[in-house]
């Protein structure tokens, strides 16, 4: 199961539809980090796909608080942010994977399938430097 968090409704719709076509069960969608935490607590999904830059409660808030609920939660961060301070904060919170926006939906699905099929989740595989 998957929850998707992004403040862009078009991205939420696109990802939801594509993931459903790929046989992923999208159990929740939200538009900020607070909704991410609430949806995670309610559904305990296999995957959280979350944007970082969102109004009010950003993805860092969401990631920090999901980590408090479950330090081993599988959280995939989507970011278009080039701010090194923010990127360092994200890395410190140890998301399962960080993908740069724009991220082709096929790449995201490939990452989800790789993680789903691995017996032990890899350490954070960051493409940010």
Predicted regions and their residues:
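Two-component/phosphorelay signaling modules centered on CheY-like receiver
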Residues: 9-28
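The short loop immediately C-terminal to the conserved phospho-acceptor aspartate in CheY-like receiver
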Residues: 8, 48, 52-53
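Conserved phosphotransfer cores of two-component systems
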Residues: 41-43, 66-72, 93
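Acidic catalytic/metal-coordinating carboxylates
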Residues: 32-35, 58-61
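CheY-like receiver
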Residues: 112, 117-129
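Alpha4 helix (beta4-alpha4-beta5 surface) of REC/receiver domains from two-component response regulators
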Residues: 61, 82-99, 110
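The feature encodes the CheY-like receiver
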Residues: 12, 29, 55, 83
């Amino acid at each position: 199961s998957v929850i998707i968090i992004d403040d862009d409704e078009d991205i939420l719709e696109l990802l939801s539809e594509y993931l459903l076509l790929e046989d992923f069960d999208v159990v929740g969608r939200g538009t900020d980090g607070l909704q991410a935490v609430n949806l995670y607590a309610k559904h305990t999904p296999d995957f959280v796909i979350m944007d970082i830059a969102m109004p009010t409660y950003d993805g860092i808030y969401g990631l920090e608080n999901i980590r408090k609920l479950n330090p081993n939660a599988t959280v995939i961060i989507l970011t278009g942010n080039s701010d090194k301070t923010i990127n360092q904060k994200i890395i410190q919170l140890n998301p399962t994977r960080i993908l740069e926006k724009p991220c082709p939906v096929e790449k995201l699905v490939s990452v989800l399938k790789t993680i789903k099929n691995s017996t032990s989740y890899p350490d954070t595989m960051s493409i940010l430097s």
